[in-house]
């Protein structure tokens, strides 16, 4: 069910009367999360588990603290999440050779395969979600979003 604010916006309002960007992004995010959760559940993953696999598919984490920072997750809650993923054979943690108190975190081949499967399903859902836009608008949106996500300057500065 759409809220009256969404319906008002969809029906067209002047720019001065439009909803705040935060509210509009929240509606879009809620729709995307609602569409992603069944895809994740069908593959035995929660949203946070998928976030971890996606990050580790990009690059191994030098340690658990770095991973927590990169995915913006509470470091104290991350341990239980990593325990679950490791028990399922989706990630591996090894003591850091330079600091035995620290553990490197990497995705396993099984985790990489599951990530690829889920990512393909999500990409298909996203294509359907964005089908209301023209191809040019889709390309523009996908080009603009990273600029809004990343801070000014070097994207690596925020990692």
Language model features by range: what are they?
Residues 30-77, 156-159:
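N-terminal helix-turn-helix DNA-binding core of bacterial DNA-binding proteins
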